[in-house]
């Protein structure tokens, strides 16, 4: 089930064109993914303690509309795909008027402490990580 994470645009995130710099969206997406994982009950600290990590392997961002100072942004995060070693999140950033500022698909992989791809441990396959299409 999608989760919506809210944040407000801060002045230091603006570029010389007076809108959010494109690189800042990566920070927004990262923050929202970590909040998403917390909300769905994914124990990220436990995953690390057990010797695993989730690495971002690819990000595809489509910029649609400029976010500006003090805009209240809603970042919708959902799990799009889940395999044995990896998955993909879908993220949509909207302003308070509902206009889409950016859309992203973020692919990630599970690795062990040596950085080698690893199967996602069963205890971390919480319901929110499983895409809605796979639950049917």
Locate the predicted segments by residue:
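Short, basic/aromatic beta-hairpin or loop at an interaction surface
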Residues: 47-54
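Short, surface-exposed acidic-centric catalytic microdomains
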Residues: 39-43
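HotDog/MaoC-like acyl-thioester-processing domains
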Residues: 3-5, 38, 68-69, 80-136
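Generic structural detector for well-ordered beta-strands
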Residues: 6-9, 60-62, 107
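Catalytic strand-loop segment that frames the active site of acyl-thioester-processing enzymes
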Residues: 1-36
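Short structured motifs
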Residues: 57-63, 75-76, 88-89
């Amino acid at each position: 089930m999608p989760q919506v994470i809210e944040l407000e645009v801060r002045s230091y995130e603006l570029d010389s064109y007076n809108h959010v710099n494109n690189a800042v969206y990566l920070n927004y997406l990262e923050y929202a993914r970590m909040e998403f994982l917390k909300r769905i009950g994914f124990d990220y600290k436990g995953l690390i303690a057990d010797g695993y990590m989730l690495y971002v392997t690819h990000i595809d961002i489509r910029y649609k509309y400029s976010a500006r100072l003090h805009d209240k942004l809603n970042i919708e995060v959902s799990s799009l795909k889940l395999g044995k070693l990896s998955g993909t999140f879908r993220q949509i950033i909207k302003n308070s008027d509902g206009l889409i500022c950016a859309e992203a698909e973020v692919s990630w992989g599970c690795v062990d402490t040596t950085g080698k791809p690893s199967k996602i441990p069963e205890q971390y396959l919480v319901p929110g990580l499983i895409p809605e299409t796979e639950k049917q």
